[in-house]
UniProtKB/Swiss-Prot annotation:
Coiled coil: none annotated. The lineage of its organism: Archaea, Methanobacteriati, Methanobacteriota, Stenosarchaea group, Methanomicrobia. The keyword 4Fe-4S does not apply. This is Large ribosomal subunit protein uL10. GO terms for molecular function: large ribosomal subunit rRNA binding; structural constituent of ribosome. It comes from the Archaea. PANTHER family: 60S ACIDIC RIBOSOMAL PROTEIN P0, LARGE RIBOSOMAL SUBUNIT PROTEIN UL10. Forms part of the ribosomal stalk, playing a central role in the interaction of the ribosome with GTP-bound translation factors. Residues 309-337 are annotated as: Disordered. GO terms for biological process: cytoplasmic translation; ribosomal large subunit assembly. Part of the 50S ribosomal subunit. Forms part of the ribosomal stalk which helps the ribosome interact with GTP-bound translation factors. Forms a heptameric L10(L12)2(L12)2(L12)2 complex, where L10 forms an elongated spine to which the L12 dimers bind in a sequential fashion.
Length: 337
């Protein structure tokens, strides 16, 4: 008995779609799977235009996308795990982190509709509104918003979470949030996964804190610099510091060892002079211990110190007088208003 073979007939336009997806995958070093649920067609077209300079956005039926992935390499086939609900593919030459950042920045606030589930806590802040007293007060209270009238305006009395994450938003609350211009949702292209050179990157990996990363690099560079200086390991970055440190260390050794070199003599003479003056000061109680020249030098040093002390005392007296005048002025101001 002859065996019957049945083959599924696929329309040409579907074959063309599958081939186009396969061609795009081969033409770009990176492609990603994007969620587009909840995005109006008009807004999606606008996003496609905004992306055209650095990426290609391809919207296709999930069944055709899966066929294209299944006919590609083993690495590409793994991306089938991220095909779900409303999906699009994006193809680019950008790196995964830059792509994720660009897509996140393109997201815009959007009102939540009745029956939708809150993805995070929806908060209304305490403060005045632009609404005059009227029926809206009852509408706000009916939606669970703590509203009252104050100064001829409707105000929100306290900050409150009117819907918790995971809760379904009611018709009344959805309408009132829109009137208050509170848009809890972010509408945009939701990157689910990216494939680059056989590696799959998901949002939890791509969502990096750039400021923290930069701070870590700066700290690491500083630590590496300090380590290289302490280890006396010369590099283009630290050579000036090492030379300055070596010069300072050698100068200290020469001074402590009393080495008579041109660059050291002034320091040694200054050090010897200071010691001489200290000894002279200690011996000055005996008139015969010092000659006239040394007495004169010691007197000049003493006069210089006295002059400095007098200047300091005068400055302190002026400061005290200014404080007294300020206190007196404050007292008169308090007395006469």
């Amino acid at each position: 008995m002859a065996e019957l073979h049945h083959s599924e007939h696929i329309p040409q336009w579907k074959k063309d779609e599958i081939e186009e997806i396969k061609s795009l995958i081969e033409s770009y070093p990176l492609f990603g799977v994007i969620g587009i649920e909840g995005i109006p067609a008009k807004q999606l077209q606008s996003m496609r235009r905004d992306l055209k300079d650095f990426a290609v956005l391809k919207v296709c039926r999930n069944s055709l996308t899966r066929r294209a992935l299944d006919q590609s390499s083993d690495d590409v086939k793994k991306m089938d795990d991220y095909i779900d609900v409303q999906t699009a593919l994006i193809f680019t030459k950008q790196n995964p982190f830059k792509l994720y950042k660009l897509l996140e920045k393109s997201k815009t606030p959007s009102p939540i509709k009745a029956g939708m589930v809150a993805t995070s806590d929806i908060i209304v802040e305490k403060g005045p509104t632009s609404f005059p007293p009227g029926p809206i007060l009852g509408d706000m209270q009916g939606a669970g918003i703590p509203a009252a009238i104050d100064g001829g305006k409707v105000v929100i009395k306290e900050t409150k979470a009117v819907a918790k994450a995971g809760e379904v938003v009611s018709q009344k609350l959805a309408a009132m949030l829109t009137r208050l211009e509170i848009y809890p949702l972010e509408v945009g292209l939701d990157l689910r996964a990216v494939l680059e050179e056989g590696s799959i990157f998901t949002p939890d990996v791509l969502a990096i804190d750039e400021e923290q990363i930069f701070s870590n690099f700066v700290q690491a560079a500083q630590q590496a610099f300090n380590m290289s200086v302490n280890a006396a390991y010369p590099t283009a970055m630290n050579i000036n510091t090492l030379l300055a440190k070596a010069a300072s260390d050698s100068r200290n050794v020469a001074v402590n060892a009393t080495v008579y070199e041109p660059g050291i003599m002034d320091i040694l003479l200054g050090k010897a002079y200071s010691k001489m003056m200290a000894i002279a000061s200690a011996a000055s109680s005996n008139d015969d211990a010092l000659d006239d020249e040394l007495k004169e030098a010691l007197g000049a040093a003493s006069s210089a110190v006295s002059a400095v002390e007098e200047v300091v005392e005068e400055q302190e007296e002026v400061k005290e007088e200014e404080e007294e005048e300020s206190d007196m002025a404050s007292g008169l101001g308090a007395l006469f208003g």
